[in-house]
Amino acid sequence: MSTVTITDLARENVRNLTPYQSARRLGGNGDVWLNANEYPTAVEFQLTQQTLNRYPECQPKAMIENYAQYAGVKPEQVLVSRGADEGIELLIRAFCEPGKDAILYCPPTYGMYSVSAETIGVECRTVPTLDNWQLDLQGISDKLDGVKVVYVCSPNNPTGQLINPQDFRTLLELTRGKAIVVADEAYIEFCPQASLAGWLAEYPHLAILRTLSKAFALAGLRCGFTLANEEVINLLMKVIAPYPLSTPVADIAAQALSPQGIVAMRERVTQIIAEREYLIAALKEIPCVEQVFDSETNYILARFKASSAVFKSLWDQGIILRDQNKQPSLSGCLRITVGTREESQRVIDALRAEQV
């Protein structure tokens, strides 16, 4: 009788893979959820498309046109996918040969770049950021041989700061003719002046990731975009699933990207930024908080005394934050999503009560 298990039949890299620990996967029984950088309240939409008996468009035209207009690019420079996470994976599948090519990213940063590469069997190279969380361009240059895709998150998750645009330009020159540079702009709505969308004409190897999960308040929709030149988009179209977006998703996304939807999104951003500044000011006055870092996003990174104890104490009170202790250079750090004023007050009151 065979002793081979089902797990033995799996690919070796999958057997050894640690899955991405999303906020939902980590669980918790809270009523103040400040661990996934979501918008704190639901936005209502009504479905207008009832043709659920038919397969959806592969790339829904109305939605693509709306997003292109919003982002300031041409429709042929836009690809829509199941969240920006699918865009991360599509770029690896289109440009990296498993067992031969590599991706490169700069921790501390978003965890899905490595998970996507490892799932596909592509090598991951890391160049930790400098002390100010900016790019180590010399370190990147030293490791570029064999790298096909470089991921840079700006503003960076979880640190919250923008990458210096001059460093981005240097990176794009270093990689010209060698690799695709991916600017992950999931949080760009909170600092739109910093977008690289206007650089696409200058850099044919630039790709930009976007999402409706943050400022558009549609994390449950799973809808993201890749902005790139048409040559890149055409390659991604070869590896994307035939029907990546369901009809209801495309319907709601098109509404969110209407002129009224854009106005509503910008009002949400204004409100979140005001709440962020309130929370930052309060955190700076709390004894257990050692340092509060500047943020260009809808979350705040802070360093705490006895951060693990603080994290657990708030968890036990139903306040769920994101522990960043295991990330390089983030010892003692917790990430706090900016929520409602009531949620901010719950966090402030709980932290003030900490005896550490």
UniProtKB/Swiss-Prot annotation:
Residues that bear N6-(pyridoxal phosphate)lysine: 214
Keyword annotations from UniProtKB, A to Z: Amino-acid biosynthesis, Aminotransferase, Histidine biosynthesis, Pyridoxal phosphate, Transferase
First-tier enzyme category under EC: transferase
Single annotated GO MF: pyridoxal phosphate binding
Pathway listed: Amino-acid biosynthesis; L-histidine biosynthesis; L-histidine from 5-phospho-alpha-D-ribose 1-diphosphate: step 7/9
Cofactor annotation: pyridoxal 5'-phosphate
Gene3D superfamilies for the chain: Aspartate Aminotransferase, domain 1 (3.90.1150.10), Type I PLP-dependent aspartate aminotransferase-like (Major domain) (3.40.640.10)
Span of the signal peptide: none
UniProt-listed HAMAP family: HisC_aminotrans_2 (MF_01023)
Family indicated by similarity: Belongs to the class-II pyridoxal-phosphate-dependent aminotransferase family. Histidinol-phosphate aminotransferase subfamily.
Protein name: Histidinol-phosphate aminotransferase
Lineage, highest ranks first: Bacteria, Pseudomonadati, Pseudomonadota, Gammaproteobacteria, Enterobacterales
